[in-house]
């Protein structure tokens, strides 16, 4: 399992659809956890509804977990996208 942390920093022109297209390249399962006080919400990023339910916004701190044969690349791609990278 590959785990990393990131801070959301998305421009307005980035969409959930773009993220789902990035994830379609990988076979690994990628989970994002968003902490809210003592609790957290989590969603499988291959589920658009799950991602929407997290209600991510700029400045949110998240944990990204990947499991599978290409987990390192999948987690890195998600972290780069969500933190505002190319």
Each language-model region and where it sits:
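Generic N-terminal amphipathic, Lys/Arg-enriched alpha-helix
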Residues: 1-6
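C-terminal structural segments of small proteins and small subunits
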Residues: 57-86
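Compact, glycine-rich, soluble single-domain proteins
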Residues: 7-54
